[in-house]
Amino acid sequence: MVASMASALARNFLGSTPRWYKMTIVMFLIINPFIVALNPFVAGWLLVAEFIFTLSMALKCYPLLPGGLLALEAVFSGLTSAEQVKHELSANLEVLLLLMFMVAGIYFVRQLLLYVFTKLLISVRSKIALSLAFSVMAAFLSAFLDALTVVAVVISISVGFYSVYHKYVSTHPEHDINNDDSIHKQHHADLEQFRAFLRSLLMHAAVGTALGGVCTLVGEPQNLIIGEMAGWNFSEFFIRMSAVSIPVLICGLATCVLMEKLKWFGYGTVIPESVYLILKQSADHDDAHRTTQERLKLVCQAIICVWLIVGLAFHLAAVGLIGLSVIILATTFTGVSDEHAIGRAFTESLPFTALLSVFFVVVAVIIDQELFRPLIQMVLSAPQEMQLTLFYIANGVLSMVSDNVFVGTVYINEAHTALVNNVISRDHFDLLAVAINTGTNLPSVATPNGQAAFLFLLTSTLAPLVRMSYGRMMWMALPYTIVLAGVGLLSTMYLLPDMTQWFYESGWLQHKAAIPVITPASH
């Protein structure tokens, strides 16, 4: 009886996850308390490594389960406190609202998005031109919208493309998008090629959000924190960042073209002709049979999308609240009144919202155990002429494994403190702020946990459909990581000081004599 109970418990634990993975998580849970007792600092870094491991195994088991167990143990073992976790969640409330409401809001305008991107996919036959179009559109949108919103759009339209083809070649009347058993064998090769095609477009678009997001005050949450701390407005932020962001943007887009031409790192796969014909046939059929009511729905969704862009660009409300308004308007004017139909919009976002909340527990451990303090102290103790380079590198390394908002906030607070204590000049502080922002945004494309948008893509329902794993995402991001991080570093070292001086001399920027009056944000 006892043996059968133990066997049943073992089977229930983490469900259908492989046995070796279950044993690994159990081993983590057993070892961690002993490491905490010996050295909490080492235990903190071990927790970070273990959490990254759960993310890398996202296709084996959704990271919320094993990551959540590790996070609970971290709180109970004293690595952090429930109060600190609550503080982190409060500090990131806008991000949580964004995930809950904006992603769901995008769900209700997906017909328009699918219509627009289907037209783009059908009309642009060159894979290089199509990849560049996806990257440029993602970069432009993410300069004004949050990267998560942009990635949610790309995920929505990719699922639309995939489901159209998958349903067409399925032999079962009850179509299951997650099951390939119903697909004829002769279609398997085309399906795999189509998956590779979608993966490349997804990665171009995801990296595009980083290219555009670094440029503007509203591009990323940490940009807003850094800009407010420095007392910069929208135009000044763009000008100061341009010494680094523009060369990076140009080189990033060139990398997009080069990868497609050379077909390296999983890029260069073209859409199979059979898939293209099916998508075109589906689009032509939809156009021919679209009713007046359906056309009006598209018009309403277009108007709502205009409101979305205007509301976000002018910061009329928190991003999540604008997303809530999109849900209200879209459901009202497209006739979605059933509770269950509305509920389906939240199935994509809420698991990730819970996972991100678990991630903030890890961030709380990083703060309470001061895991980054040795690196921060090393950077601040370096000679001023080396600080730009070191700030960029230190931010880049840490933002690969931690929350970008947290990393950016920690470093800008330290730089602000140095300014207040007259350790550095105001002009040097402004240069450091640029290095902090670019260092936080650019190298973080290296890993999915470095960019929230990448993590969202990895843990979305689309990832298993197109076989996007943690390792594959890192591999496909590698050329972009090298180019973005490398060009960003060289621009920070050699272009930023001289270009900033030229901006002063040309009257584009004014020297700021006063210390910013913004109180450093606690995070």
From Swiss-Prot:
Localization of this protein: Cell inner membrane
GO MF annotation list: sodium:proton antiporter activity
Lineage: Bacteria, Pseudomonadati, Pseudomonadota, Gammaproteobacteria, Aeromonadales
Catalysed reaction equations from the record: 2 Na(+)(in) + 3 H(+)(out) = 2 Na(+)(out) + 3 H(+)(in)
Record's keyword terms, sorted: Antiport, Cell inner membrane, Cell membrane, Ion transport, Membrane, Sodium, Sodium transport, Transmembrane, Transmembrane helix, Transport
Family the UniProt entry places it in: Belongs to the NhaB Na(+)/H(+) (TC 2.A.34) antiporter family.
Gene assigned in the entry: nhaB
PANTHER family xref list: NA(+)_H(+) ANTIPORTER NHAB (PTHR43302:SF1), TRANSPORTER ARSB-RELATED (PTHR43302)
Physiological role: Na(+)/H(+) antiporter that extrudes sodium in exchange for external protons.
Transmembrane residue ranges: 28-48, 51-71, 89-109, 137-157, 237-257, 302-322, 347-367, 390-410, 445-465, 476-496
Alphabetical list of InterPro entries matching this protein: Na+/H+_antiporter_NhaB (IPR004671)
Entry protein name: Na(+)/H(+) antiporter NhaB
